[in-house]
Amino acid sequence: ADGSYVPIFQVPPVYPRRALERGIEGCVMLKFTVTKVGSTKEPEVEWAVPPGIFDRAAMRSALKYKYKPQIRDGEAIEVPNVRTIIVFKIDDPGKPADYTPEGCA
């Protein structure tokens, strides 16, 4: 049966130490390709808040993602331009559960 690509395994990013120490939160919108075997390749930053702080950590994390590949006519196919947003937020019991850093919603 044909089917869309489905995320199986998403590795949480490593929070950059300097950003954590300074209390900086943010997010990165990534674009990448899901391969025929369900791995990811060629991650690119589409935008980031704040720019340049979390880009490398987000790309490293996305390269470890695993997907069930997309199936068309019984064959696995590569899917370019898959987008995902990776949010970096500091755990704080005082924040609501659905809290998102400014500029990331």
Residue ranges and their predicted role:
Residues 1-33, 57-104:
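Short proline/glycine- and basic residue-enriched helix-capping loop/turn segments at helix->loop/beta transitions
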